[in-house]
Amino acid sequence: EVPEKGDMEAFLTDGLRSLLNSIPVIEMSEYTVRWPGHIQMFIDKRDSGVLDEVDLQAQWQYDSKTPEFTWMEVMAEAFDGRRVTWTVQDHGCDDGHSMARCTGLVTYCCIIEWLEDPDMLPPGVHAPESLPSEVISRIINMMLDEGVEIIGPMTSHS
């Protein structure tokens, strides 16, 4: 259940691959959360042959008049059994929709940090979790300044 949104469904997806190389992980899973019936509707349309890609792409166009939100919960359990949870939530605003704000702002903040310190990382592709902890803290604060709600450890807004 998502607070203030109600019951949701979740299905396994793959977006944690960078953690395999950056954090000592024994087991991990990622679920995408959607309204009840969401995935089954698309399975049924696909299986019946009525899934229209052109119509689907038109529906994916951003419409600032359509309210939307992004909600993410990250739970981690340490080897000693300690658990921590972070919740990220955004409802979008005039400058973009919520998913772009929750993911794109991270990239934007990383670029700002890199421009200020080009020697921070060697050339290549780097996941945000490979950044120094003080950089991650600044990125979290930038996201909070932009109105993205982040609740959990290390999210004190200074």
Regions found by a protein language model. Give the residues of each.
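C-terminal catalytic/substrate-binding lobe primarily of soluble NAD(P)-dependent oxidoreductases
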Residues: 1-158
